[in-house]
Amino acid sequence: MEIVQVIISKQPDEPIQIIDKIYRDGKDLKLFVKDLNKFVLDLCKLNITRNKELTMIPADIMRQCIQIATKTPNYELVDILDGINNLLDKIKYEQNPKNLIESELIILCLK
């Protein structure tokens, strides 16, 4: 959720730090992007339908997600979703996706 908030607020330095931490912790960056895609899709569903039952958002963060979904214009969430979808295609066969992920997230922040 944090990375979506910094993309929306146009803070390009934050995604770099988040991705670097995930990388240093030895976590799978491709899996992170897949999970991010699912999360942004759920935010779009929430924004469009206002029905939290159509999402897989955990109850403990639902209130924050509702705020993000209602305060963010749907075109902006769709732009983020489109960028993440494109990123998923690009990293499919990438051996070291860190640089590609960082660059795509910077672009999303500065759009």
List PLM regions with ranges.
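Extended, largely alpha-helical regulatory/partner-binding modules appended to the mid-to-C-terminal parts
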Residues: 1-111
